[in-house]
Amino acid sequence: MTNTRKSHPLIKIVNHSFIDLPAPSNISAWWNFGSLLGVCLGLQILTGLFLAMHYTADTTTAFSSVTHICRDVNYGWLIRYMHANGASMFFIFLYFHIGRGIYYGSYTFMDTWNIGILLLFAVMATAFMGYVLPWGQMSFWGATVITNLLSAIPYIGPTLVEWIWGGFSVDKATLTRFFAFHFILPFIITAMVMIHLLFLHETGSNNPSGMNSDSDKIPFHPYYTIKDILGVLFMMITLMSLVMFTPDLLGDPDNYTPANPLNTPPHIKPEWYFLFAYAILRSIPNKLGGVLALVFSILILMLFPILHSSKQRSMSFRPLSQCLMWMLVANLLILTWIGGQPVEHPFITIGQLASVIYFFTILILMPSTALMENKLLKW
């Protein structure tokens, strides 16, 4: 008699995905982030569901309902801060996951990579709409500024913005639809994650060497299930430390002031995980140009498989490319810092310089360095 785990139509899928899955024997902790993102998504859906039970999507009561959750609901403060800081953890892991993909050349799995970029866009949209829901000052003005960017689209722009707003400004209709979208998107993301995994399991995982590992595979369970559980443990320690000791560390104090359309905050800025893109947006003094730069700063990820010019897949044995990779990371950190600074000298110049370096490194420096490394192989 065959084992139920291997014969049952439903359990069989789980078995082939998480138990009897052949995995490379040498994948490092950088491969932990996929499972951590899965845990994050589950955590966000769970905490979000409980928050939605007490939240009201109405301009007059939204802010009060969040206050009510924190003050009157049993462990409401815990659920709220786990949800808010869980989003931060989600983005940290996302950026690590993408960075790992770039460093080890995982983007050569085109299907997996492209659905991953669509996932990134979906998560960014969800996070943006979630930030609007507490209806604080930064929620309101963030929504106003970011949705207003769409008015830069030629011909249909202004009409499109009013259509998204559901009126002539960010108001009750906007908040209601943002709540609806914020609720539904995580489930769409879950479906996309399944497609992401489906494509990944077609090819099997990449590994640090970037070489074919078919000759040396080990079962996913128990080796990587244990490794993933350890990763989850570290994640929960970090998340709960944030939630319990400094829950507002990554938030904006302005969001503790109820939304007021008549009073603009001195510095409008998004959550920390969008600051790098916000800095790129602000570094171009033209509205449409800025919007295009903003979109392309993420879309540029789709070019990585095309721009790959090295004979080796991974950067493990390419010191020059490694230098550029870490330069890119440092540059993104500089952009993140600039995005949170006021628009004045010297921050404007630093932001413009960092934006140029960002695109220049990815589009020109990295491919040309890879070609040079190919030449060096012949020495």
Swiss-Prot record:
Transmembrane feature ranges: 33-53, 77-98, 113-133, 178-198, 226-246, 288-308, 320-340, 347-367
Binding sites annotated in the UniProt record for heme b b566: H97, H196
Alphabetical keyword list: Electron transport, Heme, Iron, Membrane, Metal-binding, Mitochondrion, Mitochondrion inner membrane, Respiratory chain, Transmembrane, Transmembrane helix, Transport, Ubiquinone
Record-listed a ubiquinone binding positions: H201
Co-factor requirement: heme b
Biological-process GO terms, alphabetical: mitochondrial electron transport, ubiquinol to cytochrome c
InterPro entries hit by this protein: Cyt_b/b6_C, Cyt_b/b6_C_sf, Cyt_b/b6_N, Cytb/b6-like_sf, Cytochrome_b, Cytochrome_b_C_euk/bac, Cytochrome_b_N_euk/bac, Di-haem_cyt_TM
GO MF terms, alphabetically ordered: metal ion binding; ubiquinol-cytochrome-c reductase activity
Sites where the protein binds heme b b562: H83, H182
Cellular component terms (Gene Ontology): mitochondrial inner membrane; respiratory chain complex III
Gene3D superfamilies per UniProt: Cytochrome Bc1 Complex, Chain C
Chief location category: mitochondrion
UniProt remark on cofactor binding: Binds 2 heme b groups non-covalently.
Record localization: Mitochondrion inner membrane
Alphabetized PANTHER family for the sequence: CYTOCHROME B
Subunit note: The cytochrome bc1 complex contains 11 subunits: 3 respiratory subunits (MT-CYB, CYC1 and UQCRFS1), 2 core proteins (UQCRC1 and UQCRC2) and 6 low-molecular weight proteins (UQCRH/QCR6, UQCRB/QCR7, UQCRQ/QCR8, UQCR10/QCR9, UQCR11/QCR10 and a cleavage product of UQCRFS1). This cytochrome bc1 complex then forms a dimer.
Note: Heme 1 (or BL or b562) is low-potential and absorbs at about 562 nm, and heme 2 (or BH or b566) is high-potential and absorbs at about 566 nm.
Function: Component of the ubiquinol-cytochrome c reductase complex (complex III or cytochrome b-c1 complex) that is part of the mitochondrial respiratory chain. The b-c1 complex mediates electron transfer from ubiquinol to cytochrome c. Contributes to the generation of a proton gradient across the mitochondrial membrane that is then used for ATP synthesis.
Name of the protein in its database record: Cytochrome b
Taxonomic lineage: Eukaryota, Metazoa, Chordata, Craniata, Vertebrata
